[in-house]
Swiss-Prot record:
Belongs to the prokaryotic/mitochondrial release factor family. It is found in: Cytoplasm. This is Peptide chain release factor 1. The keyword NADP does not apply. One of its GO terms (molecular function) is translation release factor activity, codon specific. The modification N5-methylglutamine is found at Q233. GO terms for cellular component: cytoplasm. It comes from the Bacteria. Gene3D superfamilies: 3.30.160.20, 3.30.70.1660, 6.10.140.1950. Methylated by PrmC. Methylation increases the termination efficiency of RF1. Keywords: Cytoplasm, Methylation, Protein biosynthesis.
Length: 355
């Protein structure tokens, strides 16, 4: 571990010099890339600096104990050694965590897809509630949310809604949300007060750059049509809506949110690239084998990951057995504690696998 940390410290020193080079500062793309590297390395180097100081202090305390004759000073030295040993253990754990391989997609923007599942009209309403929850969370994080495609349900909410979320670390936080979300509550139309259970599925994909997904436009059939509103009525007399069909895989993507056909095409291509990436990633994960897959983020769309129990006012994430007894706040976008708990569980799992 020390050799790796020394190499990181050396790299950090090199980047520190490069980042103040006027020629690099003039190239915004290169400067942004270096600045990102600098921030990532500094997190590790800062802890490593404290760790080296701890080792030096520990060595001094042990030396003092070996030569000191006075009982009072020896007791002080022993206390300091005990304290420094505890700090050393904690710092080593922190460094192990910081050295864990990072998901290269964590810094990417997100394609978020929410679809009503079982439960009829109530499932559509719940899909709308989930969209609002993520929208409010995006606001709190100062991320930008843009709707790509929406199909409203007859009783409010959505049969399906797809959007992009742009912001620092968006995928790294939202990737744990993929799966089936279940709701238990009394619908507004229920006269006997019976609790109904319905569900909605959430898919979170990293938004991929053109260079990261090999997309041959010759493999894509493009259809244009007039955008439509609820019930199918036309809301636009121009053929601005886009439907893309990826012929080799059969994946179909539509976008009609923008008035411009070009903008709809750009958004649809983003979704298509993300879905193709997901398909390729699933092949790789299947090849790895079930025993090495993460329980926290398996990525399986059929996994029932969370229950929102309205009568009891609680939200439970079944992957880690974590419950929050403040459902109204969660539905208003306060999902940070849930995500943090999932991140901690994921990191602990990866540390154990690497042990």
């Amino acid at each position: 571990m020390i050799d790796k940390l020394e190499a990181i410290e050396k790299k950090y020193e090199e980047v520190s010099k490069q980042i103040v080079d006027p020629s690099i500062m003039a190239d915004m793309k290169q400067y942004a890339s270096l600045n990102k590297t600098y921030k990532e390395l500094s997190k590790i180097v800062d802890v490593y600096t404290v760790y080296k100081s701890n080792l030096a202090n520990l060595e001094s305390a042990k030396t003092l104990l070996s030569i000191e004759k006075d009982a009072a000073f020896r007791d002080l030295a022993k206390e300091e050694i005990d304290s420094l040993e505890l700090q050393k253990t904690q710092l080593e754990e922190d460094l192990k965590f910081l050295l864990l391989p990072k998901d290269p997609n964590d810094s990417k923007n997100v394609i978020l897809e929410i679809r009503a599942g079982t439960g009829g009209d109530e499932a559509g309403i719940f899909a709308g509630d989930l969209f609002r929850m993520y929208s409010r969370f995006a606001e709190k994080m100062q991320w930008k949310l843009s709707i790509i495609e929406e199909v409203e349900s007859t009783s409010g909410g959505y049969k399906e809604i797809i959007c992009s979320i742009a912001g620092e670390g968006a995928y790294g936080m939202l990737k744990y949300e993929s799966g089936v979300h279940r709701v238990q509550r009394v619908p507004a139309t229920e006269t006997q007060g019976r609790i109904h259970t319905s569900a909605a599925s959430v898919v979170v994909l990293p938004e991929m750059d053109e260079v990261e997904v090999d997309l041959d436009m010759n493999d894509i059939r493009k259809d244009t049509f007039c955008s439509s509103g609820p019930g199918g009525q036309s809301v636009n007399t121009t053929y601005s809506a886009i439907r893309l069909t990826h012929i080799p895989t059969g994946i179909v993507v539509s976008c009609q949110d923008e008035k411009s056909q070009i903008k709809n095409l750009e958004k649809a291509l983003k979704v298509l690239r993300a879905r193709l990436y997901e398909q390729e990633l699933k092949k790789q994960q299947d090849a790895i084998g079930a025993e090495r897959r993460s329980m926290v983020k398996s990525g399986d769309r059929s996994d029932k990951i969370r229950t929102y129990n309205f009568p009891q006012g609680r939200v439970t994430d079944h992957r880690i057995g974590y419950t929050i007894h403040n459902l109204p706040a969660v539905m208003d976008g306060a999902v940070g504690d849930l995500i943090e708990a999932l991140q901690l569980a994921d990191n602990a799992e990866r540390l154990q696998q690497g042990a």
